[in-house]
UniProtKB/Swiss-Prot annotation:
UniProt binding sites for Mn(2+) 4: 855, 857
Phylogenetic placement of the source organism: Bacteria, Bacillati, Actinomycetota, Actinomycetes, Mycobacteriales
Record: residues binding ATP 2: 729, 768, 770, 775, 800-803, 843, 855
Sequence positions that bind Mg(2+) 4: 855, 857
Domain ATP-grasp: from-to ranges: 138-333, 693-884
Subunit (UniProt): Composed of two chains; the small (or glutamine) chain promotes the hydrolysis of glutamine to ammonia, which is used by the large (or ammonia) chain to synthesize carbamoyl phosphate. Tetramer of heterodimers (alpha,beta)4.
NCBIfam families linked: CPSaseII_lrg (TIGR01369), PRK05294.1 (NF003671), PRK12815.1 (NF009455)
Residues reported in the UniProt entry to bind Mn(2+) 3: 843, 855
BP-aspect Gene Ontology terms: 'de novo' UMP biosynthetic process; glutamine metabolic process; L-arginine biosynthetic process
Record protein name field: Carbamoyl phosphate synthase large chain
Length: 1112
């Protein structure tokens, strides 16, 4: 079937910001789709609110709209294209996760698609409904002869209670049309049911929840399937969850292909999956179906399906080399599977099901340390913020590699402290899944538990437990052997052990380098295998490699020789986590593409299956490997050998992937690896407070005063000397507590007692905190002789809120010419003083007309993609070229950088871009079910970001809020309760809200201040105050939970009752999903955004239009 000739213009909806449950995998999917559609001659319009994505680069679509993904804004895009005589023919919603699917459903239901004659392709409305609606899907499973868990769809709490009475406790609560298990959970008591079902009904766009019998402890499997318009179906991959039912699949270790299924069970699952796919009606494209098997009797039930490309699709694509999103896009425009050629073999068609001769393991990355008090129990609500994937010739090798890929400070088993407790305690702990369960399983086996005891306690299949048991036996061999001989060392490496693990068991080898030296002496190195989709039946034309230690010393590597071009290795950023996300992958991808175009051979090393960088055709070669010193060095040697007789490896880039590669720079350089760009010594200089302070002193640049304390008395003296408030950050942290702003001595003592372990080895840093200062972020390039300012961003929140969590505007909204010139001079002095070659990010605070330097990072920052989108200058591409020898003058001449001027001087008519952080507070709860605090501070907590662009700040800010959290209210009630120090500053914003017609609620002190300033308000009592006969008021929290508040303005108090009151207020706002502003500056910005919304003139603008304006 040829491509449909009636389709000329396709709209692709992206997935928006990185969220828990919906992450970078959809950038990978969407980027693939856009490239394929344009290659087929179609015009592509894209809408996505996330500036950190590759897909929102202007070259991937004809019209790129960085706009909120709501039915309103998507309709504005469709209308704008129609008005310009450029009608959109079809909407492809299956590549942007749940966000895109839900938006497509709304556009269908509100008639927008019919109004503009836009067809849904990939999955029609009925198929989406049948796949996503719990009851309809259950009916389909029954119709095709399958079985579902006993359950009922409920629309009211009364229906929920009746269903629970019938099924008995525990039950699983699952809302419809949500992602990452949001709102779902296991309810063990009537109280759990009331809370979870109430929130689930609120979380579900269709206002219903499924109450389901508990299948906790069953084995969980997934199938990834694809279907074309001629009803050809392929099963791309089977995936088995290491963890049993009850742990969300995104939080589970998963294995491909499935390890413990019999062929009979697999064939039954496959047949059922294909029948369901046909009955649901996914005409073209991919879908994911989840199954559960009772380990006691083999009963098979169908859990759910995603009638779209999903998180598992990205994993399956990277695991097999079968590009699901790319093929789904081709199927959506009319091709059939037999007409699509496999990119890796270049000769087999896509209707050949992939075959694996290796094992793939994915493991989740958690960030519980960022949310003190959050319950770390793993449940049906997804909590992980990222993931790593590894490939090996056997399960245990792949498991070892993925454990060291997670970058948790360990290199696998035995490289950290052992779990605590006697055997009975460890087995009891295994009954409640947590992120430390792998270590508990190994430890339980090591101290005497049987495989059966561990399997029974943990719910993990005995086969997996036995595999870890094999490692425990190997450990005993390693510790007991008088001499570590070649056979035992080779077998240890074959079982996935890192040099660090072996060194931990053999102290006489004097650490990792000693093990490495022994391996080199014995000639024990990994071979590099190729992912080829067909178990070596056909030759792979795409160099996509993974390492394995073979028992046969004569095993050959599959890295092909390449002697013509100089090789550049690019170290990626590893698993996403809070503080190091997709923004760094963006810079790595840009480096790969631009350096390939410049004539280098690019080699990407990364272990994150969600990203564009690990697509097999992003770089010239891809190694899916852990980003550790050992693994990177082995790849370097393999590439050097493959380039013998030619230029070989001419450089390794560590500057673009965030902290992970930077942490390897010094050791790699000492091992003889050529680091290009800013040298490791310069990176160290910028991070050393004393040395960097000397650079600032020589340049005459002020920085906030600070001191190091090794006791509370010393900390108290330093704080008294430099003045409160102070910012304290311990060098050794307990319980995940990081930095905190402290306003008085009592709070300082409480914080140090609670959060730190002070000693001469572990001092605490006490910084003067610049209250009410404006924070400024600068991204710049330096080639050693010239500095190019990429962009100057003004933070909307005050200094003290982590820059990754603060909204910011570009160009700056309140800075004058003299301020920006001061920023330029300071940035130039720092770049030359540190010795930067490439990118530099500097953070400043402006207070009382003095510009203070807060910190400098000589690397790509998380704002690089945002600045690049806002200014039309590809900073990461320019950085890569500079690191390999190009000058800023040459890049200006080529048109890569602006020919004159730079990002410090923006045109007067330049649109305003606002970046807003997206925070995951609603995902985390305390052990008692209470919400965690949504207060912002110096510790970063956001998972992603959005961007709003408009011709004025208010409209841009309103867009950013709509994209991140939903629209700001245009009317209704605002609750205000602020600290005394903020009351004067908040008078004007609150007065403006009252003038706009908002009703104001306030607690006693705030209400009194507002009335004195002529602002009418209604008083409510504080949460911790008891009602009395003379003040029978309802509390602020009661008003919020009753749905009577549309926005909250709440700034934090001290540590006593009001502080707790603030926590309860903010938690209620998060649970009710209403805007909650916790800074004065945020309140002022929100008021401007509300005014813009009320004016009703917020339009849409493509990046191509924006960039043509800026260039002209």
């Amino acid at each position: 079937m040829p491509r449909r000739s009636d389709l000329n213009h396709v709209l692709v909806i992206g997935s928006g910001p990185i969220l828990i449950g919906q992450a970078a995998e959809f950038d990978y999917s969407g980027t693939q789709a856009c490239r394929v559609l344009r290659a087929e001659g179609l015009q592509v319009t894209l809408i996505n609110s996330n500036p950190a994505t590759i897909m929102t680069d202007p070259e991937y679509a004809d019209h790129t709209y960085v706009e909120p993904i709501t039915a309103d804004f998507v309709e504005k895009v469709i209308a704008q294209q129609a008005e310009r005589g450029n009608k959109i023919d079809a909407l492809l919603p299956t590549l942007g996760g749940q966000t895109a699917l839900n938006t497509a459903v709304k556009l269908y239901e509100n008639g927008a698609l019919e109004r503009y004659d836009v067809e849904l392709i990939g999955a029609n409305f009925d198929a989406i409904q049948r796949g996503e609606d719990r009851q309809k899907f259950k009916d389909i499973v029954t119709k095709v002869g399958g079985e579902s868990a006993k359950s009922r769809v409920c629309f009211t709490m009364d229906e929920v209670r009746d269903t629970v009475a019938e099924l008995g406790l525990p039950v699983v609560v699952r809302p419809s049309f949500t992602m990452g298990g949001l709102g779902s959970g296991m309810a063990y008591s009537a109280d759990d049911v009331e809370r979870m079902a109430g929130e689930g009904l609120a979380a579900s766009p269709s206002a219903n929840v499924l109450i389901e019998e508990s299948i906790y402890g069953w084995k969980e499997y997934e199938l990834e399937l694809m279907r074309d318009g001629r009803d050809n179906v392929v099963v791309v991959c089977s995936i088995e969850n290491f963890d049993p039912m009850g742990v969300h699949t995104g939080d589970s270790v998963t294995v491909a292909p499935a390890m413990t299924l019999t062929d009979r069970e697999y064939q039954k699952m496959r047949t059922l999956g294909i029948e369901i796919l046909r009955e649901v009606g996914v005409d073209t494209g991919g879908c994911n179906i989840q199954f559960a098997v009772n380990p006691k009797d083999g009963r098979l039930i169908v859990i759910e399906m995603n009638p779209r490309v999903s998180r598992s699709s990205a994993l399956a694509s990277k695991a097999t080399g079968f590009p699901i999103a790319k093929i789904a896009a081709k199927l959506a425009i009319g091709y059939t599977l037999d007409e699509i050629v496999n990119d890796i073999t270049k000769e087999t068609p896509a209707c050949f099901e992939p075959t694996l001769d290796y094992v793939v393991v994915k493991a989740p990355r958690f960030a519980f340390e960022k949310f003190p008090g959050a319950d770390a129990t793993l449940t049906t609500t997804m909590k992980s913020v990222g993931e790593a994937m590894s490939l090996g010739r056997n399960f245990i090798e792949a498991l070892g590699k993925v454990m060291r890929s997670l970058e948790t400070g360990r290199a696998g088993f035995w490289t950290g402290e052992d779990p605590v407790g006697e055997l009975g305690e460890v087995l009891a702990r295994l009954r409640t899944p947590t992120d430390g369960r792998l270590y508990d399983i190994e430890y339980a086996l090591r101290i005497g538990a049987t495989v059966e005891e561990v399997a029974e306690a943990s719910g993990v299949d005995p086969w997996f437990v036995d595999q870890i048991g094999g490692l425990v036996e190997l450990r005993a061999e390693l510790t007991d052997a008088p001499v570590l001989g070649e056979e035992l060392l080779r077998r240890s490496k074959h079982h996935g052990l890192s040099d660090r693990q072996i060194a931990a068991l053999r102290p006489e080898l004097a650490g990792e380098m000693g093990v490495r030296a022994l391996r080199q002496r014995l000639g024990i190195h990994p071979v590099f295998k190729t992912v080829d989709t067909c178990a070596a039946e056909f030759e792979a034309k795409t160099p996509y490699h993974y390492s394995s230690y073979e028992m046969d010393p004569a095993a050959e590597t599959e890295v092909a020789p390449q002697t013509e071009r100089g090789k550049v290795l690019i170290l990626g950023s590893g698993p996403n986590r809070i503080g190091q996300g997709i923004e760094f992958d963006y810079s790595c991808v840009h480096a790969a593409t631009t350096l390939s175009e410049a004539g280098f051979e690019t080699v990407m090393i990364n272990c994150n299956p969600e990203t564009v960088s690990t697509d097999y055709d992003t770089a010239d070669r891809l190694y899916f490997e852990p980003l550790t010193f050992e693994d990177v060095l082995e790849i370097y040697y393999a590439e050097q050998r493959s380039g013998e007789g030619g230029p070989g490896v001419i450089g390794v880039i560590v500057q673009l992937g965030g902290q992970t590669p930077l942490g390897l720079a010094e050791r790699l350089e000492k091992a003889g690896v050529p680091i290009v760009g800013t040298k490791p010594e310069a990176i160290d200089l910028a991070e050393d407070r004393g040395e960097f302070g000397e650079v600032l002193r020589r340049a005459g640049l002020p920085a906030p005063r600070f001191g190091m304390a090794t006791s509370f008395d010393q900390a108290r003296r330093i704080a008294a000397e430099i003045g409160y408030p102070v910012l304290v950050r311990p060098s050794y942290v307990l319980g995940g507590r990081g930095m905190e702003i402290v306003y008085d001595e009592d709070t300082l003592e409480g914080y140090i007692t609670r959060a730190t372990q002070l000693s001469p080895e572990h001092p605490v840093l006490v910084d003067r905190f610049l209250e009410d200062a404006i924070e400024i972020d600068v991204d710049a390039l330096c080639d050693g002789t010239e500095v190019y300012i990429g962009g100057v961003m003004e933070h909307i929140e005050e200094a003290g809120i982590h820059s990754g969590d603060s909204a910011c505007a570009l160009p700056p909204v309140t800075l004058g010419r003299s301020d920006i010139e001061a920023v330029r001079r300071a940035t130039e002095a720092i770049a030359f003083g540190v010795g930067v070659v490439g990118l530099l990010n500097v953070q400043y605070a402006l207070k009382d007309d003095v510009l203070y330097v807060l910190e400098a990072n000589p690397r790509a920052s998380r704002t690089v993609p945002f600045v690049s989108k806002a200014t039309a200058v590809p900073l990461a591409k320019a950085c890569a070229r500079i690191m390999l020898g190009a000058s800023i003058a040459e890049l200006r001449e080529e048109g890569v950088l602006a020919r004159t001027g730079d990002g410090a001087a923006t045109a007067r008519n330049a649109p305003v871009a606002v970046k807003e952080a997206v925070l995951p507070f609603h995902r985390f709860r305390k052990a008692d079910g209470a919400q965690i605090d949504s207060l912002l501070g110096p510790e970063m907590k956001s998972t992603g970001e959005v961007m709003g662009i408009a011709h004025d700040f208010g409209s841009a800010f309103a867009k950013s809020q709509t994209a991140a959290y939903g629209s700001l209210p245009a009317s209704g009630t605002v609750f205000v309760s602020v600290a005394n120090r903020d009351k004067r500053s908040l008078v004007f914003p609150v007065k403006r809200l009252a003038d706009l017609g908002f009703k104001i609620l306030a607690t006693e002190g705030t209400a009194e201040m507002l009335r004195r300033n002529g602002i009418p308000c209604e008083e409510v009592r504080k949460h911790f105050e008891e009602p009395s006969a003379d003040r029978p008021l309802r509390s602020a929290v009661e008003a919020i939970k009753a749905g009577d508040v549309d926005m909250v303005l709440n700034t934090p108090y001290g540590n006593s009752g009001p502080r707790i009151d603030g926590y309860e207020i903010r938690s209620a706002a998060v649970s009710m999903n209403i805007p909650c502003v916790t800074t004065v500056q945020g309140a002022s910005a929100a008021v401007q955004g509300i005014e813009a919304g009320i004016r009703g003139d917020i339009g849409v603008m493509s990046l191509q239009e924006l960039h043509s304006t800026l260039v002209s």
